[in-house]
């Protein structure tokens, strides 16, 4: 019993930290063009696909913010700190089923973060399309990724 409780506490702590970092990074004012100490990249998007044959609709909305700023060398050997927050929400629905997926990730590094493409709705819908509505559905939580500045890939 204590083991389950510890895992639940750890999970809620991770969710809280992710939510806290996400809110903080999104609340930062955007860097002014030409500012030497900070740089911002913001990507927002939505897409929708309709399959008339299956009477299905797939929707995807995503947002990503990459923020970098100058920091003391004690904080980052490169003199900069790079932080990224990504949100992606997908939904596939047809008369007999509704599937939702959400991904939130936060990254922080002393090195520039690699550009990651947003998940593609066109690569996700074929998987959902081939599911049969009579299959038993199993509920599970989506994995959440929280990385600290000291972790390496």
Curated annotation (Swiss-Prot):
<comment type="similarity">
    <text>Belongs to the luteoviruses movement protein family.</text>
</comment>
<keyword id="KW-0813">Transport</keyword>
<comment type="function">
    <text>Transports viral genome to neighboring plant cells directly through plasmosdesmata, without any budding. The movement protein allows efficient cell to cell propagation, by bypassing the host cell wall barrier.</text>
</comment>
<protein>
    <recommendedName>
        <fullName>Movement protein</fullName>
    </recommendedName>
</protein>
<feature type="region of interest" description="Disordered">
    <location>
        <begin position="107"/>
        <end position="153"/>
    </location>
</feature>
<dbReference type="GO" id="GO:0046740">
    <property type="term" value="P:transport of virus in host, cell to cell"/>
</dbReference>
<keyword id="KW-0916">Viral movement protein</keyword>
<dbReference type="InterPro" id="IPR001964">
    <property type="entry name" value="Luteo_VPG"/>
</dbReference>
<dbReference type="Pfam" id="PF01659">
    <property type="entry name" value="Luteo_Vpg"/>
</dbReference>
């Amino acid at each position: 019993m204590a083991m389950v409780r510890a895992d639940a506490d750890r999970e809620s702590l991770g969710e809280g930290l992710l939510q806290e970092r996400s809110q903080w990074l999104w609340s930062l004012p955007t860097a002014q063009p030409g500012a030497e100490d900070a740089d911002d990249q913001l990507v927002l998007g939505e897409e929708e696909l309709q399959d008339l044959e299956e009477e299905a609709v797939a929707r995807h909305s995503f947002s990503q913010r990459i923020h970098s700023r100058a920091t003391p060398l004690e904080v980052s050997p490169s003199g900069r700190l790079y932080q990224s927050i990504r949100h992606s929400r997908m939904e596939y629905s047809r008369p007999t089923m509704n599937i939702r997926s959400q991904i939130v990730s936060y990254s922080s590094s002393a090195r520039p973060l690699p550009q990651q493409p947003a998940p593609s709705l066109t690569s996700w819908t074929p998987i959902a399309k081939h599911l049969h509505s009579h299959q038993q559905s199993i509920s599970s939580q989506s994995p959440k990724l929280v990385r600290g500045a000291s972790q390496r890939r």
